[in-house]
Design a protein with these regions (language model features):
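Transmembrane alpha-helical core residues of multi-pass small-molecule transporters
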Residues: 13-14, 58, 167-168, 185, ...
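Hydrophobic alpha-helical transmembrane segments
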Residues: 4-11, 52-53, 90-95, 125-129, ...
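Membrane-interface helix/loop boundary segments of multi-pass membrane proteins
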Residues: 138-163, 167, 195-202
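N-terminal, membrane-interfacial amphipathic/helix-forming hydrophobic leader that caps
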Residues: 1-77, 218-296
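Membrane-embedded alpha-helical segments of multi-pass membrane proteins
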Residues: 56-64, 125-130, 138, 142, ...
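Functionally important transmembrane alpha-helices
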Residues: 182-242
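Juxtamembrane helix-loop-helix connectors linking adjacent transmembrane helices
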Residues: 26-51, 71-141, 148-153, 281, ...
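Small-polar-interrupted transmembrane alpha-helices in polytopic inner-membrane proteins
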Residues: 98-104, 132, 136, 157-173, ...
């Protein structure tokens, strides 16, 4: 089947399965069914149980759609399952994500007058860790494991990176306070995640990075995460008391993030031009490690 037909088939299935699983959420929290967007955003920000069940529903909807397309069309299981939860890959991604977030915060502190307030440890961070891990796994499975891998099989590598990253960015278009800088930065993050995936054919690396990026940005340092508000252990604020220009969407809405992410993209591209190990195909359902070759 043509890759575009497969992708166009995937999204309606993703919506269908997500709605079906979300029906359970509506049964448990009937008030969410008729809530306005503002009321819904408030419910997600204040009700941890609702937030967790909602993410589980989306997680199940995403994987149901991926498995349906893979089993019915490709007749095989999704390839990324082989590398999705490798401990060493997750750890590497977590550390790399932490480095980037800390670098962004360091530059922010050096270029603006900031103050850090300690709010104290909140047990809710453990719940947020579960939620952000579910988000990282489901979004990476969809964006890199399914969409990018299938595009890469039937088109140019760079075209595949650009298109899958654009789709990844647009997936966040309905988030609160979404703006063009946020769209650009999520697009750039998508490119970087594709690079990480190609570097070792290991989806656990971008999953670890994605998880670390969100967890540190929100529940640790107190910024919004792609427009989603959380209570942080720390709170980094403008010393004058005024809000940062990017505050509504989070660090992903800042030009500092644009510069840092762009630097890492260029650095990874230059240092790996002759070192990245690529396969001739990223099989949608199985990766033949023996087929890996060095890219010239």
């Amino acid at each position: 089947m043509n890759i575009w037909t497969k992708i166009l088939l995937f999204f309606p299935l993703w919506l269908l399965f997500s709605v079906l699983f979300y029906g359970i959420v509506f049964l448990i929290y009937p008030e969410s069914y008729s809530a306005s967007k503002t009321e819904f955003d408030t419910l997600i920000s204040t009700n941890y149980g609702f937030l967790l069940i909602s993410q589980v529903a989306l997680f199940l909807g995403t994987f149901s759609a991926i498995f349906f397309v893979s089993k019915v069309i490709d007749k095989q299981k999704p390839a990324f399952l082989n590398s999705m939860l490798k401990p060493e890959g997750l750890l590497f991604g977590v550390v790399l994500g932490a480095i980037e977030i800390l670098l962004i915060i360091l530059i922010l502190s050096l270029t603006t007058k900031t103050k850090i307030t300690f709010h104290g440890f909140n047990i809710s961070i453990l719940l947020y860790a579960i939620i952000f891990f579910l988000i990282a796994v489901s979004e990476e499975a969809m964006s890199r494991g399914f969409i990018f891998a299938n595009l890469y099989n039937q088109s140019n590598k760079y075209f595949s990176i650009i298109i899958s990253s654009l789709i990844f960015s647009l997936m966040h278009a309905f988030n609160s306070s979404f703006n063009w800088i946020g769209m650009l930065n999520i697009f750039l993050i998508g490119i970087f995640f594709c690079q990480l995936y190609l570097k070792r054919m290991n989806l656990s690396i971008p999953i670890g990075f994605h998880f670390s990026w969100n967890l540190l940005q929100g529940p640790v340092f107190g910024f919004s995460v792609s427009g989603f508000t959380t209570q942080g252990i720390l709170k980094i604020e403008n010393f004058s008391g005024s809000k940062f220009p990017f505050e509504g969407f989070g660090l992903e809405g800042s030009l500092i993030s644009t510069l840092v992410i762009s630097f890492f993209i260029v650095y990874l591209y230059i240092t790996n031009t002759r070192k990245i190990m690529l396969s001739e195909k990223i099989e949608p359902s199985s990766i033949n490690v023996a087929a890996l070759k060095a890219e010239a």
